[in-house]
């Protein structure tokens, strides 16, 4: 996730001049687990950008049976940053964005070791795991270099958060390392 090659590729996909790591996380869907409701990523984060990008790396085969990701094509163009939460209802996001209700989501199975990239504003969710095994993935969210703090704590540690004011540039290399710049 820290490699300049991956940063360069991700930056070109996002159409930005530089990328910093926002955060990474493991996503483990247990056996017979419920679906993950459709949601957007950026509204949760401590910056506001239409150009943030996430890489989702399958550690196990992600299949229709064990909860692969689903994307709603073109939904990143909605450009709203309202945090509507990840509800219990898989389709609750469409109550807020009714204009996208009839756009068919596309399942994206991916083999172990494969990766998906998505814009932080694309509607996405994951199917149920209908198997006795785990469905594991690792994600890394990248923010464009130069993003500013929007007042949301999200994953920022309290010590760093205490130093920030709304509008401050999130350029702390210890917290959000620069992985690539054009």
Language-model-derived ranges and their functions:
Residues 62-123, 147:
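Double-stranded beta-helix
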Residues 16-19, 31, 42, 47-48, ...:
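Active-site region of the double-stranded beta-helix
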Residues 39, 46-64, 109-111, 117, ...:
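Short, conserved beta-strand element in jelly-roll/cupin
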Residues 85-86, 115-117, 121-182:
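Non-heme Fe(II)/2-oxoglutarate
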Residues 3-7, 31-43:
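Short acidic (Asp/Glu) patches
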């Amino acid at each position: 996730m820290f490699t300049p090659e991956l940063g360069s590729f991700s930056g070109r996909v996002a159409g930005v001049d530089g990328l910093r790591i926002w955060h990474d996380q493991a996503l483990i869907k247990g056996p017979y687990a419920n679906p993950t409701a459709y949601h957007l990523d950026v509204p949760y984060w401590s910056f506001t950008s239409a150009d943030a990008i996430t890489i989702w790396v399958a550690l196990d085969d992600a299949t229709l049976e064990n909860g692969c990701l689903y994307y709603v094509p073109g939904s990143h163009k909605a450009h709203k940053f309202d945090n509507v939460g990840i509800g219990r209802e898989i389709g609750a996001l469409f109550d807020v964005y009714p204009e996208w209700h009839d756009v068919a989501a596309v399942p994206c199975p991916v083999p172990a070791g494969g990766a998906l990239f998505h814009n932080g504003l694309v509607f996405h969710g994951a199917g149920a795991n209908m198997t006795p095994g785990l469905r594991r993935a690792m994600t890394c969210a990248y923010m464009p270099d130069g993003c500013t703090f929007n007042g949301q704590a999200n994953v920022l540690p309290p010590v760093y958060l205490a130093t920030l004011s709304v509008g401050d540039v999130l350029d702390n290399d210890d917290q959000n390392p620069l992985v690539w710049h054009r």
